[in-house]
Amino acid sequence: MNSKAMQALIFLGFLATSCLAQAPAPAPTTVTPPPTALPPVTAETPSPIASPPVPVNEPTPAPTTSPTTSPVASPPQTDAPAPGPSAGLTPTSSPAPGPDGAADAPSAAWANKAFLVGTAVAGALYAVVLA
């Protein structure tokens, strides 16, 4: 095999490795068994003779008495703060601080170990092609 064919083969391997490293993993599929057929339910015929209703003894209501004093509204409570903007939300206050620059979240691609390994293999193949 000449060197150009070998380089083309290695380059195709690099391309396939790079594509596989970036492709998402297939979702696992579960096969559910088909539902089993249930026998038809037969309705039972009601008996032709109806039973008489059972008498219910209702309790007698208690006599109601009217209150002697009329209800009066209670005075408002004063321990709650008055509605309105608080002192910290005035237009002259500074905006809230942003996220700390040193606390950046890791990249999702580099957190995936399969992507990292695939990229390392692709880099090795690329180095072989350029050598």
Swiss-Prot record:
Propeptide cleavage-removed residue intervals: 108-131
Glycosylation sites recorded in the entry for this protein: 24, 26, 28, 34-35
InterPro entries to which the protein is assigned, alphabetical: AGP (IPR044959)
Residue numbers bearing the Pyrrolidone carboxylic acid modification: 22
Biased amino acid composition, Pro residues: 25-38, 49-64
Keyword entries, A-Z: Cell membrane, Glycoprotein, GPI-anchor, Hydroxylation, Lipoprotein, Membrane, Proteoglycan, Pyrrolidone carboxylic acid, Signal
Stored PANTHER family: CLASSICAL ARABINOGALACTAN PROTEIN 2 (PTHR36321:SF23), CLASSICAL ARABINOGALACTAN PROTEIN 9 (PTHR36321)
Name of the protein: Classical arabinogalactan protein 2
Organism field: Arabidopsis thaliana
Gene (name only): AGP2
